C-alpha cells in the first residue's frame, strides 16, 4: 500500500529519528508562536531554551543542527530576536568559528604523527596504570593546544586501527589482507581475549576523554567556550592560563590521582588488562610498519613535528588569532607533505563543519536570551550574593546546566549576562574576572558527567568504534562518575575556600597579571 502524502512527510522529516521525537519537534514549532503572541515573550523565550537543551540532550536520536535550527529560524521569523542580532553574536564570536573550521582541519593533516606517538605508548609500555596515565596526560597536554574533538578523533582512529589489526590476525589473516573487522560471526576469535581487549580500549578511551577536559579547561584554545570567555574578558593566552591555574592545577592533580586509583582498585569498569596475545600482535604490527617506513614517510613525520612546534609557539606567544594559526597549519603540512588534491583537502573539513553550523544556531538562541532578558532574574539572584558565595553559585549553576547541555552554549550565555552586569555597574571589573574563572571552570569540569556536556564524549559515543568495544551511553556515564565527583568537588573547593581569590591577589601583587578596566569589555561591544 503506497504512503499517503502526510505519511511521506513524517517519514522524510528528520530522517530516521523516532516518530515521537518528530512529533515533539513539530509540537514545539506549533506551540512557540502561540506562547509568544498570546501568553508572554519571556515565557516563550524560556520554553525555546528548554526545547533547545532537549535537542542537545537527544543528540543521539537526531543531530541537533536540524531541530535546533528549525526552532531558531522560527524564533527569528516571529520576532523573538532579529537576524541582525544573530549576525552580531556570530561576528563577536568569529574566532571560535575559525578555530573549529581551520584548527580541526589542520590537525587532520597531523594525524600520522599522533597515531605514531600513541602506537608507541601502547606497544612499549606494559604497565596498565602507566599506559592509562600516559593516555590521560597526553590527551590533557594536546587538548590544552588543540580542540578536544580533534584529540578524541585521533585516539578513536588509533583504537579502531588496533582493533582491526587484532581482529584480522586473530581471524587467521596477515597484516596486508583485506578484512571486515566489524564482523561478529568469526568463530576463530577467543571470546575472553576479545572481551579483555574491548575493556582495555574502553578504559583508555575514557581516560583520554577525561584528559581532554583536564587539559582543555587550562587554556583559551582548549575548548571553544574558553575562547568566547577570553574574548569577552580581553585576556591573552598567558593571562588566561595564570588566572585559571588556582582551580585547574588542583583539579589536574586530582584527576591524575583518580586515574591511578580507579585502575589500581579496578572500580567503575576500569582495570582491564591488555592480553599478552593481543600485545604480541600489536608489537609485530608496529615492527612491520617501522620496517616498511620509507624516507618519504619519515620526512612527513619530521614536517609534522616542526609544524607542531610552530602550532604551540604560535598559540602560546599569541602570534596570530587561533583560527589563522590553524590555517597556517593546513598550508604548511599540505605544502611540504605534497597534499595538493582538492578532494584530499576537503576530507579534513568534514569533521568540524556540522558542529560549526550548530554553533551558529547556538548564537541564534543566545540572541533570543539577550533580547528577551531571559537570564536576568537568575543572574540578579546570583549577583545578590557577594564574594566567594557568588563565585560558588555561578560555578554550580554552570556545572549543573553543562551536564545536560552543550558547554559552549552554557558558557556563552553566562559570560554575556555577567558582562551586562559589569556594564550596568553591578559588579567591579576584578569581580568580573573572578566570575569568568568560575564560569569557565564550572562549564568545563562537571560536564564530563554525560556525553551531552562534552562534545568529545558525544563524538566518541556516536563513532563507529563505540559498538565494537561495547561502549554505551550508560556505561560512559558510569565510567565517568568517579571523575565527575572528584573534578566537580575539587573545583568548587578551590573557589569556596578562597584559594582562587587569594591566588589571584598574589598574581596581581607579583605583576604576573594586571587589573583591567571595565572599558576593556565595553570596547569590543561598541566596535561592531
Swiss-Prot record:
The chain crosses the membrane at residues 10-30, 63-83, 96-116, 131-165, 204-224, 240-260, 305-325, 359-379, 391-411, 449-469, 476-496. This is Na(+)/H(+) antiporter NhaB. It is found in: Cell inner membrane. Pfam families: NhaB. It is a multi-pass membrane protein. Coiled coil: none annotated. The keyword Transport applies. Na(+)/H(+) antiporter that extrudes sodium in exchange for external protons. GO terms for cellular component: plasma membrane. Keywords: Antiport, Cell inner membrane, Cell membrane, Ion transport, Membrane, Sodium, Sodium transport, Transmembrane, Transmembrane helix, Transport. GO terms for molecular function: sodium:proton antiporter activity. Its main location: membrane. Belongs to the NhaB Na(+)/H(+) (TC 2.A.34) antiporter family. It catalyses: 2 Na(+)(in) + 3 H(+)(out) = 2 Na(+)(out) + 3 H(+)(in).
